């Protein structure tokens, strides 16, 4: 993939941060009660930003973009082994939600249908069983839905909005409602691929178990 100059500027500003550095920056902003917006960005989102002015504005206004597609790193010539592994395993997502769980932060989940929002909640609780899901809401095409969702969110007044909306709905909702939402942090996860495969962490655990099983089998065989 080749990135345009605008695409490079949009994603390269944060791609040099390690996950640890990003988390420290976000923690600092949260402790200072500064409204913070984070978006996971993949190649499709960047392509949309080229053709849709509102998506472009929304992404440019985000405080942090998290690269969700290692192809972006390669195209932006910012590819390092550490960053590639962090992106493959979605380390920021995992470490950030571990912090939310540990600190008992109120999380409001949004998606494009009741089925999608239920699946997103199940996905999060499957990984972070003590995560505090304080509310969930749907953004679809029905009249007044956007205003109703803003009201639902503000009644809960969550620490974090976790958005699983697809692009461009996610970026447009944030662009038009950022100033109205009572929240500390917006995390636009979108429909990035790790929703389907859970998280690299699970894969790591499985690999570790496989290695242990293999070691056990070898030891058993050797001691016969």
Segments (PLM) and residue ranges:
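Metabolite-binding pocket within alpha/beta catalytic cores that recognizes anionic/polar moieties
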Residues: 13-99
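Proline-aspartate-enriched helix->loop->beta-strand connector
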Residues: 153-167, 183
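Single conserved hydrophobic/aromatic residue that forms the stacking wall/gate
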Residues: 1-12
């Amino acid at each position: 993939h080749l990135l345009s100059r605008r695409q490079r500027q949009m994603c390269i500003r944060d791609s040099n941060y390690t996950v640890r550095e990003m988390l420290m920056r976000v923690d600092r902003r949260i402790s200072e009660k500064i409204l913070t917006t984070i978006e996971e960005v993949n190649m499709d989102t960047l392509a949309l930003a080229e053709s849709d002015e509102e998506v472009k504005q929304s992404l440019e206004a985000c405080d942090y973009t998290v690269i969700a597609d290692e192809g972006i790193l390669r195209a932006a010539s910012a590819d390092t082994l550490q960053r590639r592994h962090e992106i493959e395993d979605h380390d920021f997502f995992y470490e950030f939600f571990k912090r939310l769980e540990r600190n008992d932060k109120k999380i409001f989940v949004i998606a494009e249908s009741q089925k999608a929002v239920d699946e997103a909640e199940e996905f999060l609780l499957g990984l972070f069983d003590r995560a505090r899901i304080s509310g969930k809401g749907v953004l679809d095409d029905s009249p007044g839905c956007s205003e109703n969702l803003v009201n639902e969110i503000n009644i809960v007044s969550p620490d974090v909005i976790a958005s699983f909306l697809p692009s461009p709905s996610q970026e447009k909702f944030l662009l038009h409602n950022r100033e109205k939402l009572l929240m500390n942090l917006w995390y636009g996860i979108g429909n990035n691929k790790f929703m389907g495969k859970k998280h690299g962490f699970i894969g790591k655990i499985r690999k570790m178990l496989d290695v242990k099983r293999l070691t056990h089998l070898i030891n058993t065989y050797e001691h016969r």
